[in-house]
Swiss-Prot record:
Subcellular localization: Nucleus; Cytoplasm, Cytosol
Name of the protein this chain belongs to: Small nuclear ribonucleoprotein Sm D2
Organism of origin: Saccharomyces cerevisiae (strain ATCC 204508 / S288c)
PROSITE patterns the UniProt entry points to: SM (PS52002)
Keyword entries, A-Z: Cytoplasm, mRNA processing, mRNA splicing, Nucleus, Ribonucleoprotein, RNA-binding
Claim: Cytoplasm is one of the keywords in the record: yes
GO MF term (any one): RNA binding
Lineage, highest ranks first: Eukaryota, Fungi, Dikarya, Ascomycota, Saccharomycotina
UniProt-listed SUPFAM superfamilies: Sm-like ribonucleoproteins
Any further remark recorded for this protein: Present with 799 molecules/cell in log phase SD medium.
């Protein structure tokens, strides 16, 4: 990747240069965590704005953190009076809109 593409404003880049820049950013920038998880098919932990947590494999994603996930386990808690109930459900495939994502973590190695 030439520094000429990285340093130039995006509106000056051609479509091919924009695609090359996006690919570079996915492999070397903050999105590399999601890209690596997608390529190696390792699960990630995703914390959502509604305080739910998701453990899933990333099938696809974009620059807005929209993700297609598979083998999804969603975890959350519910309060019933003084009792706290841990809830979970399984979803085989899920499209997750990126604006609900707070943080994406690698799953710990067991």
């Amino acid at each position: 990747m030439s520094s000429q593409i990285i340093d130039r404003p995006k509106h000056e880049l051609s479509r091919a240069e924009l695609e090359e820049l996006e690919e570079f950013e996915f492999k070397h920038g903050p999105m590399s965590l999601i890209n690596d998880a997608m390529v190696t098919r390792t699960p990630v932990i995703i914390s959502l704005r509604n305080n739910h947590k998701i453990i899933a494999r990333v099938k696809a994603f974009d620059r807005h953190c929209n993700m297609v996930l598979e083998n999804v386990k969603e975890l959350w808690t519910e309060k019933k009076g003084k009792n706290v109930i841990n809830r979970e459900r399984f979803i085989s495939k899920l499209f997750l809109r990126g604006d609900s994502v707070i943080v994406v973590l690698k799953t710990p190695v067991e």
